[in-house]
Amino acid sequence: MQLNNLKPAAGSKHAKRRVGRGIGSGLGKTAGRGHKGQKSRSGGFHKVGFEGGQMPLHRRLPKRGFTSLTKEFTAEVRLGDLAGLPIEEVDLLSLKQAGLVGEMVKSAKVILSGEIDKKVTLKGIGATAGAKAAIEAAGGSLA
């Protein structure tokens, strides 16, 4: 076997179909475009989503939702993650150093997810009602 003798397997390659080249080809005259109509004309196309003048679906349906501008600057911290911290007084800086919130975060809130059994004092951090009750039950407080 030599490189100049290599050929693709029989039937694996198909010749490009040439349209509009006589009736014997099966795609002569109208070249597979049918008779008349916008799609048969040269340059005949319509925009994506165009429905023939009918009000398009994306305009018939109402707008919904929005993008929050504060999303990347706020974070939530799980109660179980607080229990794993080696410090007793928790503020935003200590959460950033522990890697629990991102560097861009300006405010955080503790949510009731997991358990806490050690005393923790939160400074400048919010907490949900359930998380606040759990922290106070463990002997901690919110400052």
Curated annotation (Swiss-Prot):
InterPro entries hit by this protein: Ribosomal_uL15 (IPR030878), Ribosomal_uL15/eL18 (IPR021131), Ribosomal_uL15/eL18_sf (IPR036227), Ribosomal_uL15_bac-type (IPR005749), Ribosomal_uL15_CS (IPR001196)
Keywords of this entry: Ribonucleoprotein, Ribosomal protein, RNA-binding, rRNA-binding
Keyword RNA-binding part of the UniProt annotation: yes
Keyword Ribosomal protein belongs to the record: yes
Annotated GO MF terms: rRNA binding; structural constituent of ribosome
GO term, biological process aspect, one: translation
GO cellular component term of the entry, any: cytosolic large ribosomal subunit
SUPFAM superfamilies (UniProt xref): Ribosomal proteins L15p and L18e
Source taxon at top rank: Bacteria
One Pfam family per UniProt: Ribosomal_L27A
Gly residues bias (residue ranges): 21-31
Disordered: region residues: 1-57
Alphabetical list of HAMAP family matching this protein: Ribosomal_uL15
Family: Belongs to the universal ribosomal protein uL15 family.
Function: Binds to the 23S rRNA.
Quaternary context: Part of the 50S ribosomal subunit.
Protein name per Swiss-Prot or TrEMBL: Large ribosomal subunit protein uL15
Gene: rplO
